[in-house]
Amino acid sequence: MAEENKTNRDDLTFEEAMKGLEQIVSKLEEGDVPLEKAIDYFQEGMALSKICHEKLQNVEKQMDFILRENGELAPFSVREEEKGDR
């Protein structure tokens, strides 16, 4: 059954994983959760957190590239204005 949950988690979108993580945090913040159940929630929360982190890293990698005028992918970097550039 744990393997089934792992498979189901892999199919989650970022938003679904975040919602699940928020629900777990809410349950744990209530404080009336038995220790064994709290550990289960914590483990599930860590798995959801990992999914969110991996999805964010993937998006970050995608955003490192933008299309050039000729259609090739190029690294993208944001240059902050320096004080003297005004």
From Swiss-Prot:
The UniProt record lists the keyword Cell division: no
GO CC field: cytosol; exodeoxyribonuclease VII complex
Keyword match Nuclease: yes
Lineage top rank: taxon: Bacteria
EC number from the UniProt entry: 3.1.11.6
Enzyme class: hydrolase
Pfam families attached to this UniProt entry: Exonuc_VII_S
GO BP: any one term: DNA catabolic process
Keywords linked to the UniProt accession: Cytoplasm, Exonuclease, Hydrolase, Nuclease
Reactions catalysed, as given in the entry: Exonucleolytic cleavage in either 5'- to 3'- or 3'- to 5'-direction to yield nucleoside 5'-phosphates
Classification via NCBIfam families: PRK14063.1 (NF010666), xseB (TIGR01280)
HAMAP family according to UniProt: Exonuc_7_S
Purpose: Bidirectionally degrades single-stranded DNA into large acid-insoluble oligonucleotides, which are then degraded further into small acid-soluble oligonucleotides.
Name under which the protein is recorded: Exodeoxyribonuclease 7 small subunit
Protein source organism: Bacillus licheniformis (strain ATCC 14580 / DSM 13 / JCM 2505 / CCUG 7422 / NBRC 12200 / NCIMB 9375 / NCTC 10341 / NRRL NRS-1264 / Gibson 46)
Gene: xseB
